[in-house]
């Protein structure tokens, strides 16, 4: 009985104290080819840990889906990138996460790689806040 109580208390402690998948503030760098520099924007995205496991014995009949902390709902915001050529479209639309969950990474809308370019990558040498 004590081991059941301990397991229950441990799970409660872990749920409260350990960071799970949640919204977090990040800064991303935005650039457009027609403009001569990048700007940094503050937004929200999902970060944290999701329970997952990798089976030792792989079963081809049962796919092994690793869960990742990803967005459940998004809204889009638009900023004007300064310094663009007169004929160029200076508006940049970016996603803002409003709700997160642990789920399969959607490769159509998310960079699911282990090592992407990162949110602060800029092709130009000039970055403005």
Swiss-Prot record:
Annotated Gene Ontology cellular components are: cytoplasm; extracellular space; follicle-stimulating hormone complex
Identify the keywords attached in UniProt to this record, alphabetized.
Disulfide bond, Glycoprotein, Hormone, Secreted, Signal
The biological process GO terms on file are: follicle-stimulating hormone signaling pathway; G protein-coupled receptor signaling pathway; regulation of signaling receptor activity
Q: Where in the cell is it found?
A: Secreted
- Cleaved signal peptide residues: 1-18
User: In the record, what terms sit under GO molecular function?
Assistant: follicle-stimulating hormone activity
Coarse class of the primary localization is secreted
Instruction: Give me the disulphide-bonded residues.
Output: 21-69, 35-84, 38-122, 46-100, 50-102, 105-112
Concerning SMART domains, the annotation shows: GHB
Q: Which InterPro entries match?
A: Cystine-knot_cytokine (IPR029034), Glyco_hormone_CN (IPR006208), Gonadotropin_bsu (IPR001545), Gonadotropin_bsu_CS (IPR018245)
Q: Which domain of life is it from?
A: Eukaryota
**Record: glycosylation sites:** 25, 42
Keyword field contains Signal:
yes
Which family, according to the similarity comment?
Answer: Belongs to the glycoprotein hormones subunit beta family.
Tell me the subunit arrangement: Heterodimer. The active follitropin is a heterodimer composed of an alpha chain/CGA shared with other hormones and a unique beta chain/FSHB shown here.
- PANTHER family tied to this protein: FOLLITROPIN SUBUNIT BETA, GLYCOPROTEIN HORMONE BETA CHAIN
Q: What does this protein do?
A: Together with the alpha chain CGA constitutes follitropin, the follicle-stimulating hormone, and provides its biological specificity to the hormone heterodimer. Binds FSHR, a G protein-coupled receptor, on target cells to activate downstream signaling pathways. Follitropin is involved in follicle development and spermatogenesis in reproductive organs.
Record-given protein name:
Follitropin subunit beta
- Biological source species: Capra hircus (Goat)
